[in-house]
Regions:
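A short gly/proline-enriched turn/hairpin at secondary-structure junctions
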Residues: 6, 30-37, 49-55, 77-79
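Hydrophobic pocket/interface hotspot
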Residues: 19-20, 29, 47-49, 65, ...
Length: 144
């Protein structure tokens, strides 16, 4: 596998403050992403959640926030309990008038290649495309 990150970008009909809140407020995160226990947008905060293919095994994701730029960027490590590999997920926001452009980058996924087909780049691409283009969009733009 080439060392190319998964990158998914989307423009939302929502102000940047609303998108940031959807990414960092525990009550909002669970509406479109995963249930995260007491999530706090602070460097060093560790969180975990289970997820995987709808018809397959669920994997325990282990994450730690490494960078916060208030209202603009959230970065955290991403690995799996009991599996080799480490990666980094970054959510970046860019104001575009009354809209917001989001850029999701998941780098280092090649380190999971030996763990099986659920860890293939196509799997990550499909998952992130769903969360960025469908789940988050529908949450942010409901009632717009």
């Amino acid at each position: 596998m080439k060392n190319e990150p998964v990158i998914v970008e989307r423009v939302y009909n929502a102000p940047i403050e609303k998108v940031w809140k959807a990414l960092t407020d525990n009550n909002e995160i669970k509406q479109w992403y995963f249930q995260l226990e007491n999530f706090k947008p602070e460097v060093g905060f560790k969180f975990e959640f289970s997820g995987g293919p709808d018809d397959g095994p669920q994997y325990l994701h282990l994450c730690e926030i490494t960078e916060i730029v208030e209202g603009r960027k959230l970065t955290y490590t991403w690995r799996y309990d009991g599996y080799q590999g480490n990666s980094v997920v970054s959510w970046e926001l860019f104001e575009q008038g009354e809209q917001t452009r989001l850029k999701l980058t998941h780098s280092g996924i090649e380190s999971f290649a030996e763990n099986g087909p659920d860890f293939a780049k196509t799997s990550f691409n499909g998952g992130w495309t769903y969360f960025v283009n469908d789940a988050l969009k529908n949450y942010l733009e409901a009632g717009v």
